């Protein structure tokens, strides 16, 4: 289309003068970030072949670009899930080299004794790699179920569940309550 005086251009527009393309540097739109409280039963995928509800079905539409999740939460995990339209921001939040903390409230069947607690803080081997919690604090609990707050700086697949499993405890509820400075 032919431009008119005062017309604005946006990131991604192609501009030609006398039929020849010209280069114009325009900053990309600012990154958007959205905090979402994911319930259990939703999957973190754009399209689920099994027809289960997805987190992306509940997000507001973007005019330009698309939402990408900052990490994932499995089907049976609830809590804070971040979304952004910036791949660079998503990488800075997810990549282990940046050390962004993720905090979880974890209900386990059984009690974490001091020996198991120390193992989880110093590191256990999971699928050939060392994994550990940055911190573990005791929460409330009655009967056979006990709550703990744990912090990790990596987000490997089912890492919190696998760590507790490595010391003989089964996670029966998992809630991400914090991602970096963002709290649920």
Task: Please report, for each region that a protein language model flagged, where it lies by residue.
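Basic, flexible Lys/Arg- and Gly-enriched helix-loop patches that mediate nucleic-acid binding at interfaces
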Residues: 1-184
């Amino acid at each position: 289309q032919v431009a008119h005086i005062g017309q604005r251009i946006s990131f991604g527009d192609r501009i030609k003068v006398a039929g020849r393309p010209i280069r114009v540097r325009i900053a990309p739109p600012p990154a958007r970030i959205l905090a979402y409280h994911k319930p259990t039963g939703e999957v973190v995928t754009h399209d689920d072949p099994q027809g289960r509800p997805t987190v992306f079905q509940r997000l507001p539409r973007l005019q330009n670009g698309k939402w990408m999740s900052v990490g994932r939460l499995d089907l049976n995990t609830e809590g804070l899930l971040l979304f952004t339209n910036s791949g660079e921001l998503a990488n800075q939040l997810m990549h282990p080299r940046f050390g962004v903390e993720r905090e979880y409230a974890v209900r386990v069947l059984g009690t974490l004794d001091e020996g198991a607690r120390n193992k989880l803080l110093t590191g256990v081997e999971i699928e050939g790699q060392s994994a550990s919690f940055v911190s573990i604090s005791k929460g409330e609990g009655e009967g056979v179920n006990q709550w703990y707050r744990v912090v990790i700086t990596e987000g490997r697949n089912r890492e919190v569940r696998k760590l507790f499993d490595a010391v003989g405890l089964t996670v029966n509820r998992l809630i991400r309550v914090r991602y970096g400075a963002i709290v649920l």
